[in-house]
From Swiss-Prot:
Major acute phase reactant. Apolipoprotein of the HDL complex. In vitro exhibits antimicrobial activity against Escherichia coli, Streptococcus uberis and Pseudomonas aeruginosa. This is Serum amyloid A-3 protein. Its main location: secreted. GO terms for biological process: acute-phase response; cell chemotaxis; cellular response to interleukin-1; response to bacterium; response to stilbenoid.
Length: 122
């Protein structure tokens, strides 16, 4: 099925008005950028035990964009964890990452996971 036909079906069947669909896609794009920014900051910071903070922060920022941002954060987070599981990385660490992801997406303060001494710019 062509993407354009799928979009039209969604609009007709689900009753999604076109402006809301455009807004959802805009939020998803912005949420994706929020997730990328958190990942980039995590790599730049290179701070021990900070990954859970950046997971929570990326999801938090993306979800604040709206339903599209929350959707993008979930898709990106789940894909990342699926890749880790496939490559054989620790299941326990993956569960902890998912907990931090859900914490951020639910609107809870990502600073709960902030490690001591992490520079304020992050």
């Amino acid at each position: 099925m062509k993407p354009s036909i799928a979009i039209i079906l969604c609009i007709l069947i689900l009753g999604v008005d076109s402006q809301r669909w455009v807004q959802f896609m805009k939020e998803a794009g912005q949420g994706s950028r929020d997730m990328w920014r958190a990942y980039s900051d995590m790599k730049k910071a290179n701070w021990k035990n900070s990954d859970k903070y950046f997971h929570a922060r990326g999801n938090y920022d993306a979800a604040r964009r709206g339903p599209g941002g929350a959707w993008a954060a979930k898709v990106i987070s789940d894909a990342r964890e699926a890749v880790q599981k496939f490559t054989g990385h620790g299941a326990e660490d993956s569960r902890a990452d998912q907990f931090a992801n859900e914490w951020g997406r639910s609107g809870k303060d990502p600073n709960h996971f902030r490690p001591a001494g992490l520079p304020k710019r992050y």
